[in-house]
Curated annotation (Swiss-Prot):
Its EC number is 3.2.2.9. The keyword Metal-binding does not apply. One of its GO terms (molecular function) is methylthioadenosine nucleosidase activity. Belongs to the PNP/UDP phosphorylase family. MtnN subfamily. GO terms for biological process: L-methionine salvage from methylthioadenosine; L-methionine salvage from S-adenosylmethionine; nucleoside catabolic process. GO terms for cellular component: cytosol. Pfam families: PNP_UDP_1 (PF01048). Catalyzes the irreversible cleavage of the glycosidic bond in both 5'-methylthioadenosine (MTA) and S-adenosylhomocysteine (SAH/AdoHcy) to adenine and the corresponding thioribose, 5'-methylthioribose and S-ribosylhomocysteine, respectively. Also cleaves 5'-deoxyadenosine, a toxic by-product of radical S-adenosylmethionine (SAM) enzymes, into 5-deoxyribose and adenine. InterPro entries: MTA_SAH_Nsdase, Nucleoside_phosphorylase_d, Nucleoside_phosphorylase_sf. This is 5'-methylthioadenosine/S-adenosylhomocysteine nucleosidase. HAMAP family: Salvage_MtnN (MF_01684). It comes from Aeromonas hydrophila subsp. hydrophila (strain ATCC 7966 / DSM 30187 / BCRC 13018 / CCUG 14551 / JCM 1027 / KCTC 2358 / NCIMB 9240 / NCTC 8049). Pathway: Amino-acid biosynthesis; L-methionine biosynthesis via salvage pathway; S-methyl-5-thio-alpha-D-ribose 1-phosphate from S-methyl-5'-thioadenosine (hydrolase route): step 1/2.
Length: 230
């Protein structure tokens, strides 16, 4: 099996890259691709850059050039569920955009025109991730909705609106739904696994700066464990 892994930032891909065997590097379209072996699997690790457009470009290039059997998005997120803490892991059951609004034309909040309202993650990949986290016994985990938008969610009014629009949302980040949309269009199974670097409404900028490496490490540890089971 060939697995594509996408992280937006250096802190989100560093551990994975350090454990790859003999990786080759390709820079294309502002993205970095590292092809090699990790945990016995052929892996293409991608550093996409931050945000929906960067993630879409990286995912499209990854799928077109390397044709992985599945895609896993790893990295950090901001926690919205009340009982999440720094370092906890959320596995996405589905991804939605929180900053898309074409409801004037009859679409759901967060639904892009001519696209589904949500991009479900692959059930087999979800189950493998759950098993791996349970075996590790290191992190609290939840499975549910993660939302994506091109903003760092630290302003009280933005947080309140997101909670009102998506009351079931567990976490928020800036790439996953874009990756999900591209995978949906290419008909490739995908999963998003995110560890919490900050919690909504709790000194988020300072928390993100302090804990991005912790979150990146926790998420990457899950991915490495998963590769051994795929």
């Amino acid at each position: 099996m060939k697995v594509g892994i996408i992280g937006a930032m250096e802190q989100e891909v560093a551990l994975l890259r350090s454990q790859m065997s003999n990786p080759t590097t390709l820079q294309l379209g502002g993205c970095e691709f590292y092809q090699g072996t990790l945990a016995g699997k052929e892996v293409i690790l991608t550093r996409s850059g931050i945000g929906k457009v960067a993630a879409s470009v990286a995912t499209s290039l990854l799928l077109e050039k390397f044709a992985p059997d599945c895609v896993i998005n790893t990295g950090s997120a901001g926690g919205f569920a009340q009982d999440l803490h720094i370092g906890d892991v959320v596995i996405a059951s589905e991804m939605r955009f929180h900053d898309v609004d074409v409801t004037a034309f009859g679409y759901e909040m967060g639904q892009m025109a001519q696209q589904p309202a949500a991009f479900p993650c692959d059930e087999t990949l979800i189950a493998v991730a759950q098993d791996c986290i349970a075996e590790q016994g290191k992190h609290q985990t939840k499975v549910g909705l993660i939302c994506t938008g091109d903003q760092f969610m630290c302003k009280p009014d933005a947080i309140a609106k997101a909670r009102a629009d998506f009351p079931q949302m567990l976490a928020v980040e800036m790439e996953g739904a874009a990756i999900g949309q591209v995978c949906h269009m290419f008909k490739v199974p995908y999963l998003v696994v995110r560890a919490m670097s900050d919690i909504a409404g709790k000194e988020q900028v300072e928390s993100f700066d302090a804990f991005i490496e912790v979150a990146g490490k926790h998420s990457a540890e899950v991915i490495i464990k998963m590769l051994g089971k795929l």
